[in-house]
């Protein structure tokens, strides 16, 4: 058995909030065989299995009475290419931002707007991660997942994944599917997405009127670094709440009472609100209770100033949710998975 299972391991290094809880059992999976061994170990010892990647989408509220398996598989390869595009396959454990940079270095465009997002390749489709006008679904080709019920491999197409806003079939069937590797369809002819104002403004300030994908990536890295705290310095999980999508009638009511509300019309007639604006308007920006707080520059980000527990962070999140619901009639949904 190559899988090394350890007991009573702190998960503080394995979640970007830096919450110090223990895993009853812990192992790292470097291959498909390791994953299968972990499933067999879980069944043999009747212990639940929790699979994690970079730990950037977790809020751990208590010690984890499971076998925690960290996906550590690595590998990037081009599986198909022609003069216009390439299909790039990456193992689930590949860190996301270095993968984006590797693709740019290969002359492949499409992922640049998703630069500097924490986490791993395998976790990206689960959330259908997105930023600055681009989502995973826009560059997705297919993926390979292990069916935890049967032990068989299955290929998922774009349609199979049922991608939505920060959503996918894998998020709803997390106990069944374990993503092993993901393939992306990337272009050799850049089609840049510069609709997001600050990106265009940053490029203009630098005198770049014909940007390359690398230029866009660097601009987005600079913007994210200014807006969002580095988890290595200040514990956080990035954007903590989803931007809520509400009925147009509710949006009109809110806008009448709060003319400055930020809303984005959707194709189905609903309106997406900026959750950060709601939280800031409610006075939570920069709030701190012990070591749990709301970031002073970005109200969408909850932070751990050092020793906050998962329960303290969760309590703060619940208070914010209640306040926003009472003030605006809007329900905020947490992005991180709660354990």
Curated annotation (Swiss-Prot):
Q: Which residues form the FAD-binding PCMH-type domain?
A: 19-189
Top-level taxon of the source organism? Bacteria
Biological process (GO) annotations held by this record are: cell division; cell wall organization; peptidoglycan biosynthetic process; regulation of cell shape
Name a single GO cellular component. Answer: cytosol
Pathway stated in the Swiss-Prot or TrEMBL entry: Cell wall biogenesis; peptidoglycan biosynthesis
Cytoplasm listed as a keyword:
yes
What keywords appear on the UniProt entry?
Answer: Cell cycle, Cell division, Cell shape, Cell wall biogenesis/degradation, Cytoplasm, FAD, Flavoprotein, NADP, Oxidoreductase, Peptidoglycan synthesis
Q: What is its EC number?
A: 1.3.1.98
What's a Gene Ontology MF term here?
Answer: UDP-N-acetylmuramate dehydrogenase activity
The stretch of residues making up the signal peptide is: none
InterPro entries, from UniProt?
Answer: FAD-bd_PCMH, FAD-bd_PCMH-like_sf, FAD-bd_PCMH_sub1, FAD-bd_PCMH_sub2, MurB, MurB_C, MurB_C_sf, Oxid_FAD_bind_N
Question: What Gene3D superfamilies does the annotation carry?
Answer: 3.30.465.10, UDP-N-acetylenolpyruvoylglucosamine reductase, C-terminal domain, Uridine Diphospho-n-acetylenolpyruvylglucosamine Reductase, domain 2
| Requisite cofactors | FAD
Q: What does this protein do?
A: Cell wall formation.
**Family per UniProt?**
Belongs to the MurB family.
Q: Which PANTHER family match?
A: UDP-N-ACETYLENOLPYRUVOYLGLUCOSAMINE REDUCTASE
What name does UniProt use for this protein?
A: UDP-N-acetylenolpyruvoylglucosamine reductase
Q: What species was this sequence derived from?
A: Pseudomonas syringae pv. syringae (strain B728a)
């Amino acid at each position: 058995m190559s899988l090394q299972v350890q007991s009573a391991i702190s998960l503080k290094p394995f979640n970007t909030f830096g919450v110090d809880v223990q895993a009853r059992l812990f192992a790292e999976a470097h291959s498909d065989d390791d994953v299968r061994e972990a499933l067999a170990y879980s069944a043999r010892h009747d212990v639940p299995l929790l699979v994690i990647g970079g730990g950037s989408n977790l809020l751990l509220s208590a010690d984890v009475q499971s076998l925690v398996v960290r996906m550590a598989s690595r590998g990037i390869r081009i599986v198909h290419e022609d003069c216009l595009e390439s299909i790039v396959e990456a193992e689930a454990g590949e860190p996301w931002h270095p993968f984006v940079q590797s693709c740019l270095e290969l002359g492949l465009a499409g992922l640049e707007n998703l630069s500097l997002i924490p986490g791993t390749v395998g976790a990206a489709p689960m959330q259908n991660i997105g930023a600055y006008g681009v989502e995973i679904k826009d560059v997705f080709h297919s993926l390979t997942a292990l069916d935890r019920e049967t032990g068989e491999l299955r290929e998922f197409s774009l349609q199979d994944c049922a991608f939505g806003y920060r959503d996918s079939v894998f998020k709803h069937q997390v106990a069944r599917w374990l993503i092993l590797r993901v393939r992306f369809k990337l272009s050799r002819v850049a089609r840049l997405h510069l609709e997001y104002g600050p990106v265009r403004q940053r490029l203009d300030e630098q005198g770049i009127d014909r940007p390359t994908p690398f230029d866009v990536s660097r601009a987005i890295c600079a913007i994210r670094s200014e807006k969002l705290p580095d988890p290595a310095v200040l514990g956080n999980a990035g954007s903590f709440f989803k931007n809520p999508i509400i009925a147009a009638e509710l949006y009109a009511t809110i806008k009448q009472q709060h003319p400055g509300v930020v809303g984005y019309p959707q194709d189905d007639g609903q309106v997406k609100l900026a959750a950060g604006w709601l939280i800031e308007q409610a006075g939570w920006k920069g709030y701190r209770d012990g070591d749990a707080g709301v970031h002073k520059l970005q109200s969408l980000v909850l932070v751990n100033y050092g020793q906050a527990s998962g329960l303290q962070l969760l309590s703060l999140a619940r208070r914010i949710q209640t306040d926003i619901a009472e003030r605006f009639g809007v329900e905020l949904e947490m992005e991180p998975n709660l354990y």
